[in-house]
From Swiss-Prot:
Family: Belongs to the universal ribosomal protein uL3 family.
Superkingdom: Archaea
Gene field: rpl3
Biological process per Gene Ontology, one example term: translation
UniProt KW keywords: Ribonucleoprotein, Ribosomal protein, RNA-binding, rRNA-binding
PANTHER family: 60S RIBOSOMAL PROTEIN L3-RELATED, LARGE RIBOSOMAL SUBUNIT PROTEIN UL3
A molecular function (GO) term: rRNA binding
Compositionally biased spans, kind Polar residues: 354-365
Entry GO CC: cytosolic large ribosomal subunit
Listed PROSITE patterns: RIBOSOMAL_L3
Stated name of the protein: Large ribosomal subunit protein uL3
InterPro entries linked: L3_arc_euk, Ribosomal_L3_dom_3_arc_sf, Ribosomal_uL3, Ribosomal_uL3_arc, Ribosomal_uL3_CS, Transl_B-barrel_sf
Length: 365
């Protein structure tokens, strides 16, 4: 019998397999685009269903009806509340300054009304609880305009090389939770001036998913995967079960290494943390964008995307949503971030919504 070569099924490229630092995923690389728009969006995973659609991609099934599993991500409007400016430092980009809008009341926040007491007024900064840049106690509109003017001068002098939008989610709009996630998004464009003007126009306002993304385009999905806790090497690394007459365990590694070097190598498959890892999945197609929990199939037909009995462990989709082809990492209700594809294939599907002939809204219970 020849030499049996069976490497582990798990990649060492993801080691060490430990828990993500934050449940809010980070994005370190951005695509280069000439169109001036925010490069991505964020939402909450509602669940999966399936559709029938006319295939518009080149291939054997082009023009035919195909089955497609899809993930529904609910995307309540993001609130743009700041600008972060970068300059080129010795080791690369470094933060030059930040401009945050003055505090404002949240009219759509579901504050509880207690007996005999007036309804409490929730403001944006009170909700964030110090999760933004430190601000003076009496941060007025005049101070905000002064800082904005200083940033404009820095851009004109050529000191600033990039500007990005600081945004916050609004999960209370969909009755999911109260505390928002704060994150940063790059802006497409050819010059710093046009990027700055885009954010300046949106400051303090809400941004909907339909204003940012296009139906049919390819996206990269960034999320923290489902946590599995401590698992053994068979499930964690996909090693083979040992033979029937092997001693001292069956779901173990046969050998953890040679006598010398007299230490256990880091490459040996071991038990440990599995899941709750930060992962990016490339080139997921955005099939459709819906509004207020409804998907428009044609001029006369509009359906509720929520299946009978609601999405399991999630409930009803009330706001805007994205319908993305295939599965998406992460648990139900978890924050999911997307960006335009950074490494799209040579043969890209057309940037338009494919013709959807059927959407399953049967119970998923």
């Amino acid at each position: 019998m020849g030499k049996v070569h069976r490497p582990r099924r798990g990649s060492l490229g993801f080691s060490p397999r430990k828990r993500a630092k934050s449940i809010v995923p980070r994005i370190r690389s951005w695509p280069k685009e000439t169109e001036v728009r925010m490069l991505g969006f964020a939402g909450y995973k509602a669940g999966m269903t399936h559709i029938l659609m006319i295939d518009d991609e080149p291939g054997l099934t082009n023009g035919k009806e195909i089955f497609m599993p899809v993930t529904i991500i609910e995307t309540p409007p993001l609130r743009v509340f700041g600008i972060r400016a970068y300059r080129m430092g010795y080791l690369g980009l470094e933060t030059a300054t930040e401009v945050i809008v003055p505090d404002f009341p949240l009219d759509n926040y579901p504050a509880k009304e207690r007996k005999g007491k007036p309804k409490p007024k929730m403001t944006f900064y009170k909700l964030l609880e110090r999760r933004i840049a430190t601000l003076p106690k009496n941060y007025t509109q005049e101070m905000f305009e002064q800082k904005l003017g200083q940033l404009e001068d820095m851009i004109k002098e050529g000191e600033i090389v990039d500007v990005r939008a600081i945004v916050a989610t609004q999960p209370w709009v969909i009755k999911l939770k109260k505390k928002p996630e704060v994150m940063e998004y790059a802006i497409g464009g050819t010059s710093v001036e046009e990027k700055f003007n885009y954010i300046k126009e949106k400051l303090g306002k809400e941004l909907r998913v339909g204003e940012v993304l296009k139906e049919g385009e390819l996206l990269d999905v960034i999320a923290v995967t489902k946590g599995k806790g401590t698992q053994g090497p068979v499930k964690r690394w996909g090693i083979k079960l040992r033979a029937h007459k092997d001693s001292k365990g069956r779901r173990k590694v046969g050998s953890i290494g040679p006598w010398h070097p007299a230490r256990v190598m880091w490459t040996v498959p071991m038990a440990g943390q599995m899941g709750f890892h930060h992962r990016t999945e490339l080139n997921k197609r955005l099939i459709a964008i819906g509004e207020n929990g409804k998907l428009k199939l044609d001029e006369n037909t509009e359906i509720e995307i929520t299946p009978k009995g609601g999405f399991p462990h999630y409930g009803i989709v009330r706001s805007d949503f994205m319908m993305i082809a295939g599965s998406v990492p992460g648990a139900i209700k978890r924050i999911i971030r997307v960006r335009p594809a950074i490494r799209p294939p040579k043969k890209k599907p057309p940037v338009q919504r494919p013709q959807i002939t059927y959407v399953s809204v049967e119970s998923k219970q």
